[in-house]
Amino acid sequence: PEESDDTVMQYHRHHAPLWETCCNRVMEVPVLRRGEIMEMEHSQAFFEIANPRLAGTLVPVFSLRSEGSYGVGDFGDLRVMIDWVAYTGQRVLQILPINDTTVTHTWKDSYPYSCISIFALHPQYVDFRQLPALKDKKKAAEFEALREKLNALRQIDYERVNKAKREYLRLIFAQEGQKVLASTEFKRWFAEEQHWLVPYAQYCVLRDINGTADFSQWKDHRTWNEEDRNSLVSSRSKAYKEASYHYFVQFILARQMQAAHEYARQKHVILKGDIPIGVNRHGCDVWQEPRYFNLNGKAGAPPDPFSAKGQNWGFPTYNWDAMIADGCRWWVRRFQNMQKYFDAYRIDHVLGFFRIWEIPVESVHGLLGQFQPSLGFTRAEIESYGLMFREDFFCRPYITEEVLSQMFGDRAEQIAHTYFEPFQGPYLRFQKEYDTQCKIKEKVEDADIREALYSLVSDVLFLRDHKRPDLYHPRISVQYDYIYHQLSEADKAAFNRLYDDYFYHRNTHFWYREAMKKLPRLIEATRMLVCAEDLGMVPDCVPWVINDLKILSLELQSMP
């Protein structure tokens, strides 16, 4: 018998041959005559899997201002950053979301995680240096003078920059638009992108005509109508004239970003994108396909050491039943669109694919949220923990004169008269005009009183399920509130057992199954490397899914 190890030769002077890591192979070799050759095929080879250690940088594109920028980092500056990453021996460049976030045309739109379209790119990232020069010399000089002023600022003036860029793009469109829209390259691109581009363009036009992105307030076209598509794509129609400006801008953005992506590949730099968990509730995505969203709730996060009252992001939550019914088409398209610009991506708040913290629309803080989906308790289940269920007591804000006295001191009587009314026995309840946090936010000017009233609204032991009123969820962090301290020691112990079971055990396998309905479809949609941001209140099932699907997780050595 003969023994052998397979080897792979690397034809590079710095690399040694790679040898198999398995035991030597034992083979029976017949006697061969001179000149005879025998070939043997092995079905498996055992080589060490490469375990590279790659360094990278995370940066928002808007911060990449260079000498030639127009007051904000753009896709041309991204190429400069790619050069620096490659020069320093790094391999990964991650950027924050670059989708359009334009709702009000003010600085409030500057938050990159509140996109109005999962496809459209933000017009502020257009690199004017890659466009034809303005033929109007006077206008060109004016814009150059403004560019120098905006670029000299220590911080980005979001409103002035975006106003100037919109005006410049309008002039370029008037100058070059007809030629670009008639080009073969544009027509080919438009055919591939029009499924989202046409509704997006109409949404932008209607947003500006109506002076608001809240489509529920528009005079007409409060949802996308597929019958409008024909007029929006016909160059002979009135609707096309204004919509085509947005086609033109998105075409420029797509070409510049794709060029930056290709440049990164040439430099052997992995360009990594960022997919926000939510979308703006007044954005084009919700307007075009409202069936995919729950508008009677807001996404957020439960309390943590950095946010004692939880977080309210304001995004609508997803109607996963509708999304799963059509194979998660909305998400698959989103990921496939990302693949045009990136080689890897970060899933923001991957916990949202297991369950999302859903907050009532009338809430400001996150304490009144509940996980959706999740397994709420029936009355019988609650009582099985040893806690006699009293709905009127457990599900109403606990407010008495004694509570107000502890919170407001000498002002308690005035507060009681202004905001409350008698209810049952010693209890008070909010007057109708102050019975939600949003009403309080709108009507109460004093910040201290406002925050105190917020806390009283959320002073409940249980929350009714948002979909099934016969089910109940324990209110998170209620152990710090007045209602909890009215319980007997036995009831506190019973509630704590129920509380720990609900948040840390009861839903674990249920949430695992929920994630596995969604994430495999999305990961298989592209060849991009998947990374997950899995910080927060992480259930035990999250590492199971992350490991099963070979998703890279976020590992931190330390946190402040």
Feature roles, as predicted:
Residues 3-10, 347:
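Targeting/processing segments of secretory and organellar proteins
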